[in-house]
């Protein structure tokens, strides 16, 4: 059904692309420097374990600045009684992987965000299809897509169930037929907006406590997902090398003041991070 809640997007860094899951076990070594540069130029990077990540295209490298979208959230009343921790993960569909296609926007929005919204409203787990939006946008290209394109489809058409239009990382060409599109109309969003950026941390915490998940487009480097000194897969901005970055869409589903961190759900499978 159409959600009366508005989807809010916190776009940390403008991008038209996204990363794919790690697919091999190569290792960063000094002797392979020339190969690494070639891989980076083609849109890849590796984590400390040698897992290779692919991106769907170019992004605004070197800019960690927040970029506000066309429609901005206004007049949000920031809660003065925010809990120390809050987590919407219980409403998520099963953690899954986008595979080797640049479909992170559709995974974050169509699969995680919209499935979560419907699950909160209906009281049971719903599994919607990232392929419904991704295939319509990519049209067989299988590269990265913009957040706004995905959100516009959810606003205009909705999104179908996984059963009606299953996802395969070997197919970004097949298009939903009219029957599938008709079923998708039950799962629309009413609107989406950007955060103002003026008090973003508390804006995000307030929205999460109102059961409103937040889309982000994040600038990442090789440190993303690496365990920190506490054993957590936390991402510390001060450690980011903005000369070697990639861009990726994810969904913010919680926060923890004890760790001074927000919790995101990713589309690289349960092996990544803290079980996904």
Positions of the model-derived regions?
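Acidic/histidine-rich, surface-exposed loop or edge segments in extracytoplasmic proteins
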Residues: 86-97, 130-137, 184
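Predominantly the structural core of cysteine protease catalytic domains
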Residues: 114, 139-265, 270-276
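Acidic helix-start/capping segments at beta-turn-to-alpha-helix junctions
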Residues: 124-139, 170-173
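A short, polar/charged loop/turn motif at coil->beta-strand junctions and beta-hairpin connectors
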Residues: 80-84, 127, 210
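Alpha-helix initiation and N-capping motif
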Residues: 4-5, 85, 126-130, 147-148, ...
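Bacterial Sec-dependent N-terminal signal peptides
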Residues: 1-28
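Structured alpha-helical subdomains that flank or immediately precede key functional sites
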Residues: 18-102, 106-110, 116-121, 142-151, ...
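Processing junctions and N-termini across compartments
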Residues: 11-12, 98, 166
């Amino acid at each position: 059904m159409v959600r009366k809640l508005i989807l809010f997007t916190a776009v940390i860094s403008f991008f038209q692309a996204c990363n794919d899951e790690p697919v091999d076990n190569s290792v960063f070594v000094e002797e392979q420097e020339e190969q690494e540069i070639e891989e980076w130029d083609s849109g890849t990077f590796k984590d400390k374990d040698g897992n290779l990540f692919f991106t769907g295209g170019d992004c605004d490298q070197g800019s960690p600045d927040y970029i506000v979208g066309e429609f901005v959230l206004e007049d949000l009343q920031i809660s003065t009684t925010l809990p120390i921790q809050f987590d919407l993960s219980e409403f998520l569909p099963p953690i899954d992987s986008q595979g080797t296609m640049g479909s992170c926007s559709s995974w974050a929005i169509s699969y995680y965000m919209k499935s979560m919204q419907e699950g909160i409203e209906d009281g049971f787990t719903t599994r919607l299809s990232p392929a419904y939006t991704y295939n319509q946008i990519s049209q067989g290209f299988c590269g990265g897509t913009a957040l706004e394109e995905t959100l516009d489809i959810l606003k205009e058409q909705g999104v179908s169930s996984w059963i009606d239009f299953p996802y395969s990382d070997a197919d970004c060409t097949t298009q939903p037929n009219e029957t599938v599109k008709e079923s998708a109309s039950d799962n629309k969003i009413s609107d989406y907006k950007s955060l103002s950026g003026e008090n973003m941390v508390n804006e995000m915490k307030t929205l999460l406590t109102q059961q409103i998940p937040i889309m982000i487009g994040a600038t990442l480097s090789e440190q993303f997902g690496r365990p920190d000194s506490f054993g957590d897969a936390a991402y510390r901005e001060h450690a980011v090398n903005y000369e070697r970055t990639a861009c990726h869409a994810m969904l913010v589903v919680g926060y923890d003041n004890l760790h001074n961190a927000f919790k995101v759900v990713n589309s690289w499978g349960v092996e990544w991070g803290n079980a996904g």
